């Protein structure tokens, strides 16, 4: 009887010692693995240059907020630059290889061959309808025209700023603008905009809501129109919807990866709608040369300074995106 009890106790003690040994072995092994992993994590980062990519936002999200995607200072060798120019350039420059020449000159400023793109547009009106800004950095050249100052100003306001836009059904609803950042942006082949302000009884002020001919015309046969009316008052609108799309837009802030260079003119265009504020000239520059070769030489010389006042972004912009988030 006593022998059986001693044997049971001895077996229990041996099992306890064995289990304790197993636990110590497992603990030592885990310590080794954890310490080795931590050692590797501490030692390797200084020797590895990684890039942290952000979340791929849906189309309804912000398309133009600059996202810093790199853990190190970014080199121009990894960026793309688009230069948009009017067709007047090709009418003046007869050299068929002028783009290759400029690419070689940009190479001397740190921009690799193939990272600089030259894109031609016919006129400001057509460019405003479909502003394809695909590069990391976008520079738009606008030749000054005294007869097109307002068109240039509206286009500059459109592409230099980020807008959040929603559809408008002008046949069914009244609309009002809440503040200075709230505008109605119309784009199309031919936009004619008429407005009728309403009082608190929804009766027209100086116009009849049932007769569009009594509405006040604020734009006529335009491709791009930014409409500003009195804030806080409902308006009935009449729009040529067959050839024009109008959106209720809110200016969210600057689009930092776009700059405009005005070619010619005595002063830089003022794109600020508020008459009480100083003109907005950020990322709006002027080159006063008569020849396009001289213009491009100046851009090559100052390209890195121009880019320094801009911010690289991670998404492109085209006209389809405009109708959701510009």
Curated annotation (Swiss-Prot):
Gene Ontology molecular-function annotations: metal ion binding
Residues annotated for Ca(2+) 2 binding in this entry: 177, 228-229, 231, 301
Cellular compartments annotated: Virion; Host endoplasmic reticulum lumen
Keywords: Calcium, Capsid protein, Disulfide bond, Glycoprotein, Host endoplasmic reticulum, Host-virus interaction, Metal-binding, Outer capsid protein, Signal, T=13 icosahedral capsid protein, Virion
Binding site for Ca(2+) 1: 95, 206, 214, 216
Coiled coil ranges: none
Keyword Transferase: no
Signal peptide: 1-50
Ranges for region GPR motif: 253-255
Post-translational modification: N-glycosylated.
Residue ranges of the region described as CNP motif: 165-167
The UniProt record lists the keyword Phosphoprotein: no
Disulphide-bridged cysteine pairs: 82-135, 165-249, 191-244, 196-207
UniProt-listed InterPro entries: VP7 (IPR001963), VP7_1 (IPR042207), VP7_2 (IPR042210)
GO cellular component assignments: host cell endoplasmic reticulum lumen; T=13 icosahedral viral capsid; viral outer capsid
Glycan attachment points: 69
Region (LVD motif): 237-239
Biological function: Calcium-binding protein that interacts with rotavirus cell receptors once the initial attachment by VP4 has been achieved. Rotavirus attachment and entry into the host cell probably involves multiple sequential contacts between the outer capsid proteins VP4 and VP7, and the cell receptors. Following entry into the host cell, low intracellular or intravesicular Ca(2+) concentration probably causes the calcium-stabilized VP7 trimers to dissociate from the virion. This step is probably necessary for the membrane-disrupting entry step and the release of VP4, which is locked onto the virion by VP7.
The family this protein is said to belong to: Belongs to the rotavirus VP7 family.
Other observations noted: Some rotavirus strains are neuraminidase-sensitive and require sialic acid to attach to the cell surface. Some rotavirus strains are integrin-dependent. Some rotavirus strains depend on ganglioside for their entry into the host cell. Hsp70 also seems to be involved in the entry of some strains. In group A rotaviruses, VP7 defines the G serotype.
Subunit structure: Homotrimer; disulfide-linked. 2 Ca(2+) ions bound at each subunit interface in the trimer hold the trimer together. Interacts with the intermediate capsid protein VP6. Interacts with the outer capsid protein VP5*.
Protein name: Outer capsid glycoprotein VP7
Organism: Rotavirus A (isolate RVA/Human/-/RK9/XXXX/GXP[X])
């Amino acid at each position: 009887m006593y022998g059986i009890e001693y044997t049971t106790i001895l077996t229990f003690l041996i099992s306890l010692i064995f289990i304790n040994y197993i636990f110590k072995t497992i603990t030592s092994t885990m310590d080794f693995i954890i310490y080795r992993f931590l050692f590797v994590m501490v030692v390797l980062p200084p020797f590895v240059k990684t890039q942290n990519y952000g979340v791929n936002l849906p189309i309804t999200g912000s398309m133009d907020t600059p996202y810093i995607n790199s853990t190190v200072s970014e080199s121009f060798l990894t960026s793309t630059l688009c230069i948009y120019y009017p067709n007047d350039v090709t009418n003046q420059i007869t050299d068929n290889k002028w783009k290759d020449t400029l690419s070689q000159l940009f190479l001397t400023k740190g921009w690799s061959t193939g990272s600089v793109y030259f894109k031609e547009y016919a006129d400001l009106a057509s460019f405003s309808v479909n502003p394809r800004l695909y590069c990391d950095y976008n520079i738009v050249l606008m030749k000054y025209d005294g007869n097109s100052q307002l068109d240039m100003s509206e286009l500059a306001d459109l592409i230099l700023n980020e807008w959040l836009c929603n559809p408008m059904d002008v046949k069914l609803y009244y609309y009002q603008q809440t503040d200075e950042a709230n505008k109605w942006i119309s784009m199309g082949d031919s936009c004619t905009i008429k407005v009728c302000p309403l009082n608190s009884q929804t009766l027209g002020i100086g116009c009849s809501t049932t007769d569009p001919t009594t509405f006040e015309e604020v734009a006529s046969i335009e491709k791009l129109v930014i409409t500003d009316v009195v804030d806080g008052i409902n308006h009935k609108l009449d729009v040529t919807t067959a050839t024009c799309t109008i959106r209720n837009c809110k200016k969210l802030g600057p689009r930092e990866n776009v700059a405009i260079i005005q070619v010619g003119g005595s002063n830089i265009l003022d794109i600020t709608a508020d008459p009480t504020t100083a003109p907005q000239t950020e990322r709006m520059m002027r080159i006063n040369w008569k020849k396009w070769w001289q213009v491009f030489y100046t851009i090559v010389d100052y390209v890195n300074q121009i880019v320094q006042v801009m911010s690289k972004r991670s998404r492109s912009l085209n006209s389809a995106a405009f109708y959701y988030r510009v």
